[in-house]
Regions:
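Short, solvent-exposed secondary-structure junction/capping segments
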Residues: 36, 50-65
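Surface-exposed patches in mature extracellular/periplasmic domains of secreted proteins
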Residues: 42-49, 89-95
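Surface-exposed, charged secondary-structure patches
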Residues: 70-116
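Short beta-strand edge/turn micro-motifs at domain boundaries
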Residues: 117-145
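Short, low-complexity N-terminal intrinsically disordered segments enriched in polar/charged residues
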Residues: 16-44, 48
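Bacterial N-terminal signal peptides
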Residues: 7-14
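A short, structured loop/turn motif at beta-sheet edges
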Residues: 40, 98-104, 129-134
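Positively charged n-region of N-terminal signal peptides that target proteins for export
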Residues: 1-4
Length: 145
């Protein structure tokens, strides 16, 4: 009995934090990291949130314009291009939906200055997927606020 309890404790300690932690809190942290990357004009820091395989669905007006499915290096390049002339002035995660077992959705609000220099408030719907112990960005859809 004692060995089985010890084995369970050992296995639990080896689980990645995102498996052992609160899924909604992990998705919130991932969504906050997206905002921090954009506000700091460091799209390279998004790399750790992008999937190893597959594409990211983007539907962006002010932060783009971009609409389609993009490979992770393209996502990074698109945001680098936007941040060369635009900016994200403020960013706030307002809510996370559901328990976030394998997929999660976060809603954020941002104050941006687009490529033409026009300020705007936008809503962002970010979708995440749990992939090999980490939450990766699978989609970002912009809405008018």
């Amino acid at each position: 009995m004692r060995r089985s309890v010890l084995a369970c404790v050992l296995l639990a300690s080896l689980l990645p934090a995102s498996y052992a932690g609160d899924g909604a809190a992990e998705v919130r942290r991932a969504a906050q990291m997206v905002g921090q990357s954009l506000q700091a004009k460091q799209p390279g820091s998004l790399r750790k949130l992008l999937p190893d395989t597959g594409k990211v669905e983007l539907s962006l007006q002010r932060l783009g314009p971009e609409d389609g499915a993009f490979a992770p290096p393209q996502v990074e390049a698109l945001f680098r291009d936007f941040l060369a002339s635009g900016s994200v002035r403020s960013y706030e995660v307002v809510r996370v939906e559901g328990e976030c077992k394998a997929h999660g959705v976060a809603h954020a609000r941002a104050s941006v200055v687009d490529r033409q220099g026009s300020p705007a408030r936008v809503g962002l719907h970010l979708t995440f997927q749990l992939e090999e112990g980490r939450w990766v960005l699978r989609g970002m859809r912009e809405t008018a606020e």
